[in-house]
């Protein structure tokens, strides 16, 4: 199934989806040293974003979240790509400075954790393998 969205930062990757149905704050929500989701309100608490394609509706929280995304990349525990319904400034800036492919305007309800997906951010597309 091919989902068409909008490129935020380019690149092409394939990997396993890690899907949250709730907005995500990187500041206080993701451990920048390990990549583990630590937000007590998250439906994916305890999961690790490392080498996953992180899928969630939108970001929330402090502007420092952009630097947490960058720190994840510097520490080698960042997601391969970020897919969201709505890109807001915090997560978009983080993806850009970290060089993480990102696409928005995607119906994330069509993606489940564990599915193999390919993100072609240059085209603004997400291909979900069935």
UniProtKB/Swiss-Prot annotation:
GO biological process terms, semicolon-separated: isopentenyl diphosphate biosynthetic process, mevalonate pathway
UniProt cross-references to SUPFAM superfamilies, sorted A to Z: LeuD/IlvD-like
Coiled-coil regions listed: none
A Pfam family: AcnX_swivel_put
The keyword Lyase appears for this protein: yes
Active site: 62
Keywords: Isoprene biosynthesis, Lyase
EC number(s) reported in the record: 4.2.1.182
CDD domains cross-referenced by the UniProt entry: AcnX_swivel
InterPro entries assigned: PMDh-S-like (IPR012016), PMDh-S-like_dom (IPR002840), PMDh_S (IPR020794)
Enzyme class: lyase
One of the record's GO molecular function terms: hydro-lyase activity
Function: Component of a hydro-lyase that catalyzes the dehydration of mevalonate 5-phosphate (MVA5P) to form trans-anhydromevalonate 5-phosphate (tAHMP). Involved in the archaeal mevalonate (MVA) pathway, which provides fundamental precursors for isoprenoid biosynthesis, such as isopentenyl diphosphate (IPP) and dimethylallyl diphosphate (DMAPP).
Quaternary assembly: Heterodimer composed of a large subunit (PMDh-L) and a small subunit (PMDh-S).
The protein's name in its UniProt record: Phosphomevalonate dehydratase small subunit
């Amino acid at each position: 199934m091919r989902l068409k969205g909008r490129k935020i930062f380019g690149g092409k990757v394939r990997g396993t989806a890690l899907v949250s149905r709730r907005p995500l704050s990187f500041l206080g929500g993701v451990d920048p040293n390990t990549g583990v989701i630590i937000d007590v309100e998250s439906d994916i608490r305890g999961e690790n974003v490392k080498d996953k394609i992180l899928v969630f509706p939108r970001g929330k929280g402090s502007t420092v979240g952009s630097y947490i995304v960058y720190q994840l990349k510097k520490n080698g525990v960042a997601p391969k790509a970020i897919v969201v319904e709505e890109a807001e400034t915090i997560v978009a800036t983080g993806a850009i400075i970290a060089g993480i492919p990102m696409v928005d305007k995607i119906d994330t309800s069509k993606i489940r954790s564990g599915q193999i997906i390919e993100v072609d951010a240059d085209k603004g597309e997400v291909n979900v393998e069935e």
